[in-house]
Amino acid sequence: MADTKIASIDPRRNVLTLVNIYEVEPERQAELVQALSETTEQAIRHHDGFVSACIHRSLDGTKVVNYAQWASKQHFDAFVQQPASRELLARFAGIAKSVAPTLCT
């Protein structure tokens, strides 16, 4: 994701942060990281209001963390409400055993 901005953690910035923790079988961790990375680079980053995303993998192989920033909750909601976005999110969830999204300011 060389063209995607790196996340900036600054309490003075007024952005919406999504922390999405996926629980995965260790043999599927790389698959989910690749799917998230490629889809973010090819599609998600082009949506209005997208700021940045960082994909992290746990050392034990059982988790993938997607730390994403959006300009506002309205921008994020608009993205999530699109049928194509719902398909992408379902694809990611299908690779994982569980997913725990948290929205933060």
Predicted segments, located by residue:
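Short beta-strand/turn micro-motifs at beta-sheet edges
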Residues: T4-P11, C54-I55
